[in-house]
Amino acid sequence: MKKKNIYIIMEMVRRELHGNLLLTLISLKKSFNVYISDSSTFKHLLKKNLINPGIIHTKSITHGEAKSKFHQNLHEKKYLITAIDEEHGLLDDFDYEEYFITNRVSKKELDKTSAFFCWGKYDYKILRKYFTKSKNKFYLTGSPRSDIWKKKINFEKNKDEEQIFKKPYILICTNFSFSN
């Protein structure tokens, strides 16, 4: 049996690498070929017909006309498009529809998508309710990126970790983007 291909599009390495590596490990165990790169590389390879159809996994589905054309090209060439929005939808005291759905998910792009993975029940329930005709495209999976944060996935114990967290500490957020 021929192995199927998964192409993972990564935009921000610092944010997405670890979660995508976890996704890669799981996919490799299930006998997929996995390729990770940025969208411009995949666009070039697609244009030159240097990659075979498979699953394209991206970090968002709605991101301007260039991404829409790329998705259309993939869709026409029989690629399956899947996505998880890396910027999730939990926004304190903001209207979810106005600030997340309108900017991050569109019916036009969702029609080209085979699966949209949700971080949690909040996203999952609202998106299924909002996009009733496409509700079966939404999957409650969690985020590979946030799975890395959990203690149960402890690839290698840091010897100093216990000492560090015994003392009080201050966490300073250095990324003040709106929904990240």
Give the residues covered by each predicted segment.
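Phosphate-coordination loops involved in phosphoryl transfer and adenosine-cofactor binding
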Residues: 3, 167
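Active-site and donor-binding regions of nucleotide-sugar-utilizing enzymes
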Residues: 4-160, 172-179
